[in-house]
From Swiss-Prot:
Keyword annotations from UniProtKB, A to Z: Blood coagulation cascade inhibiting toxin, Calcium, Disulfide bond, Glycoprotein, Hemostasis impairing toxin, Metal-binding, Secreted, Toxin
This protein's record includes keyword Nucleotide-binding: no
Organism whose genome encodes this protein: Bothrops jararaca
Compartment annotation: Secreted
UniProt protein name: Snaclec coagulation factor IX/factor X-binding protein subunit B
Tissue: Expressed by the venom gland.
S-S bridge residues: 2-13
């Protein structure tokens, strides 16, 4: 199960952020 503000997709959880981020920033943010 995913947190309420995350979206399940192919067995993983994804979260949509309001501000765009590149992958490097997203990985550091996690």
């Amino acid at each position: 199960d995913c947190p309420s503000d995350w979206s399940p997709y192919e067995g993983h959880c994804y979260r949509v952020f309001t501000e765009p981020q590149n992958w490097a920033d997203a990985e550091k943010f996690c």
